[in-house]
Amino acid sequence: CACLVGSEMCIRDRCVALTGTSLSVCGAAMQGLLKNPLADGSTLGVSSGASLGAVISIAFGITLPGIPLAGTMSMAMLFAFLSLVVILGLAYRLDGSLSTGTIILIGVIYSMFVSSVLSLVITFAPDKVQSITFWTMGSLAGRGYVHVLVLLGALVVFGGVLFGCARELNAFAVGEDNARHIGVNVRRVKLTVMIAVSALIGVCVSVGGTIGFVGLVTPHMVRLITGPNHRRLLPASAFGGAIFLMLCDLLARTLFDPRELPVGVVTSFIGSILFVVIFIRTRRGEK
């Protein structure tokens, strides 16, 4: 029994570490791409779309036989992809250059729209409100090796793409026009980074629900140590994100033992405090 519990905890820890790594790398990449310190992997609205897919699966009992949470994961990833197509399509129609302001605006509007649809779905499944609420708060309890492999595969593929764009992300720091002048294909890099981030976020949301502030706070903390160079920032953010989420998950399990908190509640509570502290220190440094 002890071996079984230990094995389950080991699987959970791996899921937590991989999720924290993925969310933090996505946050660092989006902050560099959009030159916006408030950006993270959810800025595009894809995480909202993934949440909608998962909630629909839970509310209406969409499952795949033999694999736990497979229906929820499949629907979340499908809706993440559809959300990206919708957001980029609207942004391209409004602004063919896919400017940062347009992308952020479309992402915010889309997230608000999805939020209203989520509320509508919940009204049609009142008996599933508790399950939906717990899932949307974020939790990695009860995950298996299938989820570890899904997270690992997504991180290797899409995380590798983001690491490969480190030089181009450094160029974005001096502005899109200047990046274009030194030979960076701005539109291609934007699309590449946004697709990779969206895919990785979609997988994370499909496995663990909505876990906020990891991709927002961790890159800020790491940047204080490594500086803005993405060749150092991205790997350091990956390491920092894993540690941050593992600490938050430990608190979620033990703070009110035997009752377990959703890890997303802990990350939001700690992350919001850390973000305020970092923001104040940064503002003081600028003065």
Task: Give the predicted meaning of each segment.
Residues S7-K287:
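Alpha-helical transmembrane segments in inner-membrane proteins
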Residues A2-G6:
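Positively charged, low-complexity/disordered segments
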